[in-house]
Amino acid sequence: MAEYFKDIPKVKFEGTSSDNPLAFRHYNPEELVLGKSMKEHLRLAACYWHNFCWDGADVFGAGTFNRPWLQAGDAMQRAKEKADVAFEFFSKLNIPYYCFHDVDVSPEGNSIKEYINNFAQMTDVLEAKQEETGLKLLWGTANLFSNPRYASGAASSPNPEVFTYGATQVMHAMNATKRLGGENYVLWGGREGYETLLNTDLRQEREQLGRFMNMVVEHKHKIGFKGLLLIEPKPQEPTKHQYDYDTATVYGFLKQYGLENEFKVNIEANHATLAGHSFQHEVATAISLGLFGSIDANRGDPQLGWDTDQFPNSVEELSLVIYEILKAGGFTSGGFNFDTKLRRQSSDPQDMFIAHIGGMDHLAIGLKKAALMIENDFLGQAVSKRYAGWNGELGKGIQGGDFNLESLANLCVDKNLQPKHVSGQQELLENKVNNVLYG
């Protein structure tokens, strides 16, 4: 396919003095922050689905974008044209990673055999594109939610044949991810939930999910895939209630089926807020549980109750999230993937670049602000001081199992304990954070 973004040059860093909307003002891939480059810290990725599989349609109207590769025609030819445009975009954006679902990159076909054959051919195409451009795959996944067969889920479907079809897709998607050097494999249970309890057997569906995830783990080890397996939590939409509601729920599920050492989580900002949590809360919770894996960077609209997948633009939110990540040692195989889509009125080809450039710049600012908080360590010092008692004789004794309820009660009476509350100084810390963010 002819060059689609022919009037757009490769995006470069020009600094804060630049007013060029097609240049980075803050994201400088090789700039060192805490001894590591921005590129290594952030591990940025762009997604295939919103950028190249969506024409701007919504439930109230037809598509608003000019996407020639989505027009009617030979499905495989259109898929190859889509790959041409996608890798042109990724390369010009100067982003190091990308992510995909199986049917983003390959026609599903009219049978499972067609699906397998088409996907194998397109994996060849993607492999060649990666070699040509130097782009890497952050993660792959299988779409087990769009086709009508998955109306009641895949792993949680009441029909074992649907379960089987979904398992087949996951096997081939994981195989392709391994072949393409993917660093993670994601499972998002968009339809793994229920619409009504009137026709749902919760225990049965949970057992099915547990078996499905065990099969995924078995296949990972069978083929020697070294990447992380990631579950992406979301509370609802498209189902009324999803079984991977939030990070804590996922942890409980994994513990029940002995999988807590096999999976991490891929946290999406908009999913966190839909679950009634802050983005920072979900990241901090995942880290505290040993589940942190990767991030889908986006944002929701506070006035809307659905997944808007807008580009991240809150430096405060991003700084606090990156602070949590840096405290924990940074990403291993994960990164920041832009699971984001343009507003359907943003129909100029430049808009796709401008939106991603903004997101990359905001993450770069957040990284630098988070690094300042790490270096100043005022938050770390405040937390250490607040919990200092647990490093004393009593605190260590309690946590070390030296006391039971009766012996603690006796100690409390014998020493006539009258503990006093000490200020948490929330407002002081909020002011200090704002001083870092805004000066």
From Swiss-Prot:
Locations listed in the record: Cytoplasm
Keywords: Carbohydrate metabolism, Cytoplasm, Isomerase, Magnesium, Metal-binding, Xylose metabolism
PROSITE patterns named among the record's database cross-references: XYLOSE_ISOMERASE
GO cellular component terms listed in the entry, alphabetical order: cytoplasm
Amino-acid positions noted as binding Mg(2+) 2 in the UniProt annotation, renumbered to this chain: 268, 271, 307, 309
Cofactor notes: Binds 2 magnesium ions per subunit.
Binding site for Mg(2+) 1: 232, 268, 296, 339
A GO MF label: magnesium ion binding
Family annotation (Gene3D superfamilies): Divalent-metal-dependent TIM barrel enzymes
Broadest EC class assigned to this enzyme: isomerase
Record flagged with keyword ATP-binding: no
GO biological process terms, semicolon-separated: D-xylose metabolic process
Active site per database record: 101, 104
Cofactor(s) of this protein: Mg(2+)
Subunit structure: Homotetramer.
HAMAP family: Xylose_isom_A
Name the record gives this protein: Xylose isomerase
Recorded name of the encoding gene: xylA
